[in-house]
């Protein structure tokens, strides 16, 4: 995806006319230097665009209004270079509906001990200008992030880049369309929910299309297009004997390719970037979409099984956040456990649909095997193990009066034994702080059995996401203790209840 090329982040300097034109000229020069350097050296995902100084209430309000109506503007970074009386910002911040970050920095890294005078002090007032801005944000209950550090500091730059990813993701989510092919898996609770509340809170829309509508598009795909895609399969994957030319399951591979092309065409024509399927509603499809879903996820689409639109949307959101980062992000499900004293493990997988972006560095196997669920022909799928290292599992649930985001930090490990009879992609991990604590906390908090699994993102990314969307965050990591965790759930119930 090249989604970051579609957006920019505005860089606004707060000041005032009290200090005279020469001071404002220097402020402008400093701002130009900082923005140019950050764009050139900081490896930011988005371009920073310097806007005119904000020195009066009208100027600031004009900038904020323009930001709202500029589709390319993903958010605004504010630097209080000098003292900028915060009452000047009230009208602008009242109408601003784009993400906001205060960069609490200054032009110089060190103090000029021998030459510092009051002119220098008046020009470089971030230390208390930023506090004035922070007060009005707190007074207005304005959600905003703060990053402190010198503009040349790599950690400060990294944090700004991380926030930019959140800002772009939020803008993308406002336009996100999720299509459900068929309805929710029958009688399942956690995959259901309030789609209207979700659209109000996050911006994405969720609607259902009959599987027959998809089948019609699938059937329109030409044999030539199918053949070209299968050639791509041949070069990208290790095909088993059954899946190769003259193999007894070769037709299943061709059918899977036709389904992939049809699904992608349907998604593109409808402007959808996330989707769900359900094995209970496959009328007209020759097989449960497995390979198609895996490859579409790798291209940046959100997906979840059994009609789980919340997880599908969350996967798309996290795919956008993690664009260009190392690792991968996938639909996942806690499937089964390995209980061993001191070495409890979780084997994660799904019937078919795990994204190859999390695979180890080798070509996945493309195979066709029996699937008892769904009642269709044997589906094609990619089989692989997952990279090792730190990861997260995230789940978005609907509690009726609010949305809760659960995040469990995990450590992905190598599979200690081969799995010769398991014909699906999988991941093996240790849950933090341990499996009993993590699973009990997850269950008590209502976490779903479907998750988004990511090597690319971490807890800080999801914390920013929750803050930006003003939703509850529940964390399970090495610091989690069940009594305190349960207390936090009770406190959250009171806090969010008071906000209704």
Swiss-Prot record:
One cellular component term from this protein's GO annotations in UniProt: cytosol
Swiss-Prot/TrEMBL cofactor(s): Mn(2+)
Signal peptide range: none
UniProt cross-references to InterPro entries, sorted A to Z: Ara_Isoase_C (IPR024664), AraA_central (IPR055390), AraA_N (IPR055389), AraA_N_sf (IPR038583), Fuc/Ara_isomerase_C (IPR004216), Fucose_isomerase_N/cen_sf (IPR009015), Lara_isomerase (IPR003762)
Catalytic activity annotation: beta-L-arabinopyranose = L-ribulose
Pathway as given in its UniProt record: Carbohydrate degradation; L-arabinose degradation via L-ribulose; D-xylulose 5-phosphate from L-arabinose (bacterial route): step 1/3
Entry GO MF terms: L-arabinose isomerase activity; manganese ion binding
Annotated residues for binding of Mn(2+): 306, 333, 350, 450
Record's keyword terms, sorted: Arabinose catabolism, Carbohydrate metabolism, Isomerase, Manganese, Metal-binding
Cofactor, how bound (note): Binds 1 Mn(2+) ion per subunit.
GO biological process, one term: L-arabinose catabolic process to xylulose 5-phosphate
EC number assigned by the record: 5.3.1.4
Domain of life: Bacteria
Sequence similarity: Belongs to the arabinose isomerase family.
Role description: Catalyzes the conversion of L-arabinose to L-ribulose.
Assembly behavior: Homohexamer.
Protein name (record): L-arabinose isomerase
Taxonomic source organism: Enterobacter sp. (strain 638)
Organism placement in taxonomy: Bacteria, Pseudomonadati, Pseudomonadota, Gammaproteobacteria, Enterobacterales
């Amino acid at each position: 995806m090249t989604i970051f090329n579609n957006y920019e982040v505005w860089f606004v300097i707060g000041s005032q006319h009290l200090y005279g034109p020469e001071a404002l000229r220097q402020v402008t020069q400093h701002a130009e230097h900082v923005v140019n350097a950050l764009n050139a050296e900081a490896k930011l995902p988005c371009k920073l665009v310097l806007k005119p100084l904000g020195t009066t209430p009208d100027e600031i309000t004009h900038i904020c209004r323009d930001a709202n109506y500029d589709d390319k503007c993903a958010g605004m970074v504010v630097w209080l270079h000098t003292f900028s009386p915060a009452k000047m910002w009230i009208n602008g911040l009242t109408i601003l509906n784009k993400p906001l970050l205060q960069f609490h920095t200054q032009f110089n890294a060190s103090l000029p001990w021998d030459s510092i005078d009051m002119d220098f002090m008046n020009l470089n007032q971030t230390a208390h200008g930023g506090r004035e801005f922070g007060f009005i944000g707190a007074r207005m209950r304005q959600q905003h992030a703060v990053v402190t550090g010198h503009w040349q500091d790599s950690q400060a730059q990294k944090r700004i880049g991380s926030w930019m990813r959140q800002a772009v993701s939020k803008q993308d989510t406002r336009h996100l369309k999720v299509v459900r092919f068929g309805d929710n898996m029958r009688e399942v609770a956690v995959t259901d929910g309030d789609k209207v509340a979700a659209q109000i809170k996050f911006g994405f829309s969720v609607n259902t299309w009959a599987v027959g509508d998809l089948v019609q598009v699938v059937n329109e795909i030409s044999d030539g297009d199918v053949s070209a895609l299968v050639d791509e399969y041949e070069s990208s994957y290790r095909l088993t004997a059954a899946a190769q030319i003259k193999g007894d399951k070769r037709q299943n591979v061709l059918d899977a390719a036709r389904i992939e092309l049809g699904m992608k065409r349907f998604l593109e024509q409808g402007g959808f970037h996330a989707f769900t399927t359900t094995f209970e509603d496959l009328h007209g499809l020759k097989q449960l979409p497995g390979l198609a879903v895996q490859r579409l996820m790798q291209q940046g689409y959100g997906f979840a099984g059994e009609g789980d639109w919340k997880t599908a949307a969350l996967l798309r959101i996290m795919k956008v956040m993690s664009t260009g980062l190392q690792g991968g992000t996938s639909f996942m499900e806690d499937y089964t456990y390995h209980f061993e004293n001191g070495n409890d493990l979780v084997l994660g997988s799904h019937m078919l649909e795990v994204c190859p972006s999390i695979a180890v560095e080798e070509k996945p196997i493309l195979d066709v095997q029996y699937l008892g669920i769904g009642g269709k022909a044997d589906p094609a799928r990619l089989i692989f193990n997952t990279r090792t290292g730190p990861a997260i599992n995230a789940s978005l649930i609907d509690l009726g009066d609010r949305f809760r985001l659960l995040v469990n930090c995990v450590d992905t490990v190598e599979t200690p034994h081969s799995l010769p009879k398991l014909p699906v992609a999988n991941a093996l991990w240790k849950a933090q702080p341990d499996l009993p604590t993590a699973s009990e906390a997850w269950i008590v908090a209502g976490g779903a059995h479907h998750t988004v699994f990511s090597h690319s993102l971490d807890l800080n990314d999801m914390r920013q996401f929750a803050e930006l969307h003003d939703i509850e965050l529940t964390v399970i990591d090495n610091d989690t203790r069940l009594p305190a965790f349960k207390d936090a759930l009770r406190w959250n119930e009171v806090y969010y209840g008071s906000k209704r």
